[in-house]
Amino acid sequence: MAKISAVERNKKRERLTKRDAGKRAELKALIKDRALEPEDRFQAVLKLAQLPRNGSKTRVHNRCELTGRPHSVYRKFKLGRIMLRDLASQGQIPGMVKSSW
């Protein structure tokens, strides 16, 4: 099990990311718009830099929903490889069967 503080920190980052997503997208669009004056674009860069660092999508780490494990997490199931294997062998994941050929 991962530390509870690490899992909670990641959840906080997810909340901040959802909250700031619109503002970030708006500022990034202004920055990329070549039709604007360079001064206006630079002001958008400064405003983007003032937003909280944890509001960026790249700060969120994929973690296992059951254990909080940060490595080898399957995006489709949001489970780590160990829990995925355990649940699949118990038949608790619909449609997943052990491969045989």
UniProtKB/Swiss-Prot annotation:
Keyword match RNA-binding: yes
Superkingdom in the source lineage: Bacteria
UniProt KW Transport keyword: no
Protein name (database record): Small ribosomal subunit protein uS14
Disulfide bonds: none
Subunit structure: Part of the 30S ribosomal subunit. Contacts proteins S3 and S10.
UniProt cross-references to InterPro entries, sorted A to Z: Ribosomal_uS14 (IPR001209), Ribosomal_uS14_bac/plastid (IPR023036)
Cellular component aspect of the GO annotation: cytoplasm; small ribosomal subunit
Species of the source: Rhodospirillum rubrum (strain ATCC 11170 / ATH 1.1.1 / DSM 467 / LMG 4362 / NCIMB 8255 / S1)
Gene Ontology molecular-function annotations: rRNA binding; structural constituent of ribosome
Family (UniProt): Belongs to the universal ribosomal protein uS14 family.
Biological role stated in the UniProt entry: Binds 16S rRNA, required for the assembly of 30S particles and may also be responsible for determining the conformation of the 16S rRNA at the A site.
Keyword annotations: Ribonucleoprotein, Ribosomal protein, RNA-binding, rRNA-binding
UniProt region (Disordered), positions on chain: 1-20
Gene Ontology biological-process entries: translation
